[in-house]
Design a protein with these regions (language model features):
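Short linear motifs in intrinsically disordered
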Residues: 46-49, 93-95, 115-118
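Solvent-exposed, flexible loop/coil residues
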Residues: 61-63, 94, 150
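Glycine-centered structural positions embedded in regular secondary structure
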Residues: 1-3, 71-72
Length: 155
């Protein structure tokens, strides 16, 4: 009888999954006639922890519960160019892993890549267009930077 330790399932490496893919939602961005008043309204009426950019939501990583992750909710000025070339009223930010390989895969699949990958202390970003003309922000986060910054979060 074959030893269970010799099965492929038993011999899989314990290394982190690096498959280029979306791992969750990183942000919800939308146009607003008055972002400041909108933030204040959501804070007052719905209890969101508000800062100058919107509200940072804090949650635990399902695969690594010791890790705190973040999602940003943010109203933008109605005339913002940040959503361009999309004409839509919103933009979704997706948390991703292995952003370089993901962009390579997207290019191979004919997806429009709007800009180059940009790197900041809190992660890497790139923007793409989906098939319906929605601009999508992809973010490979470094959540520990937000944790170190402190500040109030929506939980």
């Amino acid at each position: 009888m074959k030893d269970k330790a010799d099965t492929p399932e038993q011999n899989k490496s314990a290394t982190k999954d690096t498959t280029p893919k979306v791992t969750g939602i990183g942000g919800i961005f939308f146009r607003s006639k008055n972002p400041k008043e909108t933030r204040e309204w959501y804070g007052k009426n719905l209890g969101l922890a508000i800062n100058d950019f919107g509200s940072p939501f804090e949650f635990r990583n399902a695969n690594r519960p010791e890790e705190i992750n973040y999602l940003t909710w943010s109203p933008f000025e109605e005339e913002t160019e940040y959503f361009a070339p999309s004409k839509k009223e919103f933009m979704i930010n997706y948390r991703v892993q292995n952003i370089e390989a993901l962009v390579k895969k997207l290019r191979k699949n004919g997806v429009t890549i709007v800009d180059d990958i940009e790197e900041f202390e809190y992660g890497k970003f790139v923007h793409i267009m989906d098939l319906e003309g929605n601009k999508i922000e992809l973010w490979e986060p470094i959540d520990s930077v937000f944790t170190q910054m402190g500040g109030e979060t929506t939980k």
